[in-house]
Amino acid sequence: MATFHFDLVSPEKLAFSGEVDQVDIPGVEGDFGVLAGHAPVVAAIRPGMLTVTAGGTQQKIIVLGGLAEVSEKGLTVLADVATSIEELDRAQFADTIAGMEARLTDKEGSELDKAIERLDHFKSIQSQLNTTAMH
């Protein structure tokens, strides 16, 4: 399988840089996969699980929003936050979700809608983490 260069950058660090076979991205308009030779595109990403496939192995990385750009040079993802599932403190993540739920009562209108949408994304990540832990 043909490979391409992939960089995953967050404000804190260069989370990943290397040649990969495929990257599956949680896009705002729907999840999408990138392979070598993909058409150029810029897409917003939502909080979710990004999957990197390289050399027959998969690495799952949690991203909390950002931007993905596919060009002739490869794929660059600029993530607001990027953490591998191995590095994630699951108890702290659960506490974050509980805090988000508690703060819903302070919001209304479009602010409430956005908070619920973000909470749903976080709960989806938590569900994926629980499923991943069972395999």
Curated annotation (Swiss-Prot):
Question: What GO annotations for molecular function exist for this entry?
Answer: ATP binding; proton-transporting ATP synthase activity, rotational mechanism
- The protein's predominant localisation is membrane
Identify the keywords attached in UniProt to this record, alphabetized: ATP synthesis, Cell inner membrane, Cell membrane, CF(1), Hydrogen ion transport, Ion transport, Membrane, Transport
Q: Which Gene3D superfamilies match?
A: F0F1 ATP synthase delta/epsilon subunit, N-terminal (2.60.15.10)
Q: Where in the cell is it found?
A: Cell inner membrane
CDD domains, per this entry? F1-ATPase_delta
Q: Which Pfam families does the record cross-reference, listed alphabetically?
A: ATP-synt_DE_N (PF02823)
The residues forming the signal peptide are none
CC per GO annotation? plasma membrane; proton-transporting ATP synthase complex
Could you tell me the membrane topology recorded for this protein?
Peripheral membrane protein
List the InterPro entries hit by this protein, alphabetically. ATP_synth_F1_dsu/esu (IPR001469), ATP_synth_F1_dsu/esu_N (IPR020546), ATPsynth_dsu/esu_N (IPR036771)
Q: What does this protein do?
A: Produces ATP from ADP in the presence of a proton gradient across the membrane.
Subunit record text: F-type ATPases have 2 components, CF(1) - the catalytic core - and CF(0) - the membrane proton channel. CF(1) has five subunits: alpha(3), beta(3), gamma(1), delta(1), epsilon(1). CF(0) has three main subunits: a, b and c.
What the record says about family reads:
Belongs to the ATPase epsilon chain family.
Protein name (database record): ATP synthase epsilon chain
What is the species of this protein?
Nitrobacter winogradskyi (strain ATCC 25391 / DSM 10237 / CIP 104748 / NCIMB 11846 / Nb-255)
